[in-house]
């Protein structure tokens, strides 16, 4: 009905109707924008912006190896969506769980292509990656490390869902990215998707709206509220107040990048957001990360960026979900923040302190967030988190009970 209203009054070309945030994507001639804005039911018009990619020592820095040794957790049973340029399903580190092609245990259990095949929504599209960025991220989260096993992901026995929203050049429209995000929510029960990694971002393009009003940020928050722990890269702009859409969304876990010496990487974007919200939430190693090199079959390559930090943190979430499948996305965020090693926010390794240095421990700052992710404490706290519920009601009476006594429960 909304589409009919638009097409009958202006020359509107429909792309997609979103259900999670009550929005429609499409195109309209510039000269019809004012007319469009006056149609009944039109609350806001946004420019369809462009999102782009934002470019094993991490396991040692964050204590992931200790998890394998002390608990045996390896991500088994957890599923993470990689919302990116795609995933190379032919790479030996991503083709199956046990690296034995004679067994039926795929690593990638579903794939949706919002760029070139959006009509195929059942998840059965053959996985591919015509850029390479998404495969590198997928390997960081859950690659097995085959054939040499020198560079496995954080959760090597977790499974993946590929959601291609960026093209072969590494960019995509807000509308296309949102289509992939909504598909992920709609299929979360079908494929048991509990976490998602989005190593992409852009800046607020509409001066008269805050980032929270941008549809892609609202969609990100809806993903979290629908049970998916969403990790988003802070960006690589290297300066403060430059965390843009969708990393500026309130409910997501925004990830900054560390060098291997655990200092903030020189490129890692810093908060606050446009609204003054402190971001990022946490920091993870993102420099010189070795992971899958797409379309090589067996190769690995080094990349740096908050793009590389984000899937690493998502891999830790997969370990936490294995330890306790009852966790909510907010449990994941809170535990990761509370167990992080606090870092004072000296900018880019400079000697001068920044204003937040005097704040108490575990208060989030705009450089490191709550600090460096500590995987083992996070997983142990996740495992020990117990939800207690009781239907019992204790009623204390100050008056002796007689045959005529009554208890009123209001």
Q: What is each residue range found by the language model?
A:
Residues 193-199, 322-409:
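C-terminal subdomain of the subtilisin-like protease fold in secreted/lumenal serine endopeptidases
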Residues 28-29, 47-50, 81-86, 112, ...:
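Active-site-proximal beta-strand/loop segments in catalytic clefts of secreted hydrolases
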Residues 138-141, 161-167, 196, 242, ...:
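Hydrolase catalytic cores
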Residues 68-112, 118-175, 189-195, 225, ...:
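Subtilisin-like serine protease catalytic core
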Residues 106-117, 244-322, 326, 377:
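Extracellular S/T/G-rich loop segment that most often corresponds to the catalytic His/Ser-adjacent loop
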Residues 99-104, 187, 399, 405-408:
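Acidic, glycine-anchored loop motifs typical of Ca2+
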Residues 3, 74-76, 144-148, 165-251, ...:
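Substrate-binding/access-modulating region of protease and related hydrolase catalytic domains
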Residues 3-76, 95-98:
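Autoinhibitory propeptides
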